[in-house]
Amino acid sequence: MRVFSKSLLLIAVGILMSQQTLAHSHHHHGHGDGGCHGHSHGGAKMHHGASKWSAEANLPHAEEEHHVHDHGHTHNHAHDHGHAHSHGDIHDHGHAHKHGHAHDHGAEKSKKVVEAGKRNMVELWMQAIGATLLISAAPFLILFLIPVQSNTDQHQNLLKVLLSFASGGLLGDAFLHLIPHALEPHSHHSQPHSEESHGQSHGEESHGHSHGAAHGHMMSVGLWVLGGIVAFLVVEKFVRLLKGGHSHSHSHSPSAPKSKDSDEEDDKKGQKKGEKDKVVSQQKPTKKTVETSSDIKVSGYLNLAADFTHNFTDGLAIGASFLVGPAVGAVTTITILLHEVPHEIGDFAILVQSGCTKRKAMCLQLLTAVGALAGTACSLLAEGVGDAATAWILPFTAGGFVYIATVTVLPELLAGHSSFWQSLLEILALLFGVGMMVLIAEYE
């Protein structure tokens, strides 16, 4: 019995001891799992089967508690492991530092953008004004090549050919360039300021306006054309009335300027024909020559006024095109230059026919460049001025051109007796002037 009870007691003690050993090993196994979990990113190695008396098993105990603490810390902040979280914190700090650096760069870039904008405005003005001076100076230089010096019998045939070319250019400019662009303001002169504004305005024109508004716009263009014709007629009638009382007192003076304006050869011929010229000057037909010369001078100044307004609209177009971009500005400049060369030659012929010398006519033509410069400046200073100005300036100028071509230039071609070949040359010159405007309008 005693032996049996002792054996039973030993068995119970053995069972208790084995349970404690199993519990401790299970606890150490769970802790090792936690340590391994804590060291999954740190790279530390744990001995999974170590006993509690092993020094190797007891050494990482503090590290395990430290890493478990880190694990709890990371769980509170970012639900991540301590090492990964601390690395993420450093990364975030570096990112914040980079953000401040970018902010500093943004301030520097804004200053550079402002300075670049100022430089771009200076370049814009230089390009636009330079293009305007180019379209004014190039035709002026071409006038030196024209052999006509003044309104004399020696150059009369060539002058009539140039006048025919001028009438064709004026009529073609009015009906193929000015009036169509006044009817469709977004085609050339009011291409303004940016592609967005063009698209907006085009959309408003196509969808927002009714047929009644379009009809009213066409009516207004037609009225402005008629207004230009009537205005030029009124100005010429008014000047005739002012000069009408002085026609008899200055009956001999117009012939003197013609002799001064002529070449030296004409002066020599005038001296040889001294008596014949005096007899002719005393006859009654001189009154008609005086009246025609005074009328032609008035029409010459009217042509200058029309040319001034036309150059103003060209300046508006150049300024608006350079606001869009340098490439658009260059194309517009070339187009206007091709258009201005024949136009200026015709205006020069009209001024010479009105009694001006070649030098005076060239100087007056050069003064009209002020209108182009004024138009360019207005277009650059106020971007929306192009639409408002071309709404009435273009058709009004077209009316002036029609009046000058039909009332002033064409009657000069019908005056006097011309040979068949001379008349053919005049008609061909007129058609050539119209044809040049057709080509320019086609490729514009």
Swiss-Prot record:
Protein topology in the membrane: Multi-pass membrane protein
Signal peptide: none
Annotated region described as Disordered, given as residue ranges: 24-112, 185-214, 245-292
Phenotype of the disrupted gene, per the record: Morpholino knockdown of slc39a7 protein causes neurodevelopmental impairments, decreased head size, smaller eyes, shorter palates, and shorter and curved spinal cords, as well as a reduction in intracellular Zn(2+) content in the brain. These morpholino elicited phenotypes can be rescued with Zn(2+) supplementation.
Biased composition regions of type Basic and acidic residues, renumbered to the chain: 61-93, 103-112, 185-208, 267-279
Protein name, per record: Zinc transporter Slc39a7
Record's compositionally biased regions (Basic residues): 38-50
Gene name as annotated: slc39a7
Lineage of producing organism: Eukaryota, Metazoa, Chordata, Craniata, Vertebrata
